[in-house]
From Swiss-Prot:
Record family assignment: Belongs to the tRNA pseudouridine synthase TruA family.
Enzyme Commission code: 5.4.99.12
Biological process, per Gene Ontology: tRNA pseudouridine synthesis
Organism expressing this protein natively: Lactobacillus johnsonii (strain CNCM I-12250 / La1 / NCC 533)
Subunit (UniProt): Homodimer.
Gene for this chain: truA
Known function: Formation of pseudouridine at positions 38, 39 and 40 in the anticodon stem and loop of transfer RNAs.
Protein name as it appears in the record: tRNA pseudouridine synthase A
UniProt-annotated binding residues for substrate: Y113
Amino acid sequence: MTTRYKLTMAYDGHLFHGFQIQPNQRTVQGVIEEALKKMTKGKRVVVHGSGRTDAGVHAKGQVIHFDYPGKEIPAKNMMLALNALMPIDTVFFESEIVDEDFHVQYSTKGKWYRYVVDQHRFTDPFNRFYTGHYPYPLDISLMKQAAKDLIGEHDFTSFAASGGQIVDKVRTIYYVNITPDPDKKQIIFDFIGNGFLYNMVRILVGTLLEIGNKKRPVDDIPRVLKAKDRQEVRTTAPASGLYLQQVFYEDIPKKYRLDLKKD
């Protein structure tokens, strides 16, 4: 008999080779499974994640599930036990016992990704692993105008890196917001959608930065979407600025449903 646990966690991704377990690499899935192995006296417990963040990508709201063998442990105690065994660049902060038909990947209603751009002239040595550096002039109003063309259901083939195994490239973006933080000299990009393709958020950010820097026309996104060609947008923002903020398992709040307000 097993018990299915759902836990929400945060991690600093810069010393991880991504989420998914890989031979001879430090991964988020790997360190969780090592902790669980200590709790089960050597028995492997397979961990499932809501998504496979790449090397260097961070999470503030990654969700995992696993089936724990043996006696049921209260959800809070499971979280406390795992935190005691996990490295200091990870933390679990929510936990619950769920039904066997719950799956962290297939039960999702949407995801929220955030990208943080550092606008200092030179790379900040203390933030270089947590932001994407872009020291060039940016017109925020142009980026906001262009971002409206991303809202709704589109084929995002042009914004997907090669190497992904997913054939269907149609996704719906519910919400895009671009917020400057003058005090920190940062720009925050937020994207909420029903799903995202391989490197999609980083490519979207790279494209919007080109528009903000006037290297690409403000009305270019509809043309790029229609082209369905990755060669149309070659700039990919660095992994260091990307955060998985939240995974939604209930309907997306209406305040984030800009697609419903689009003409």
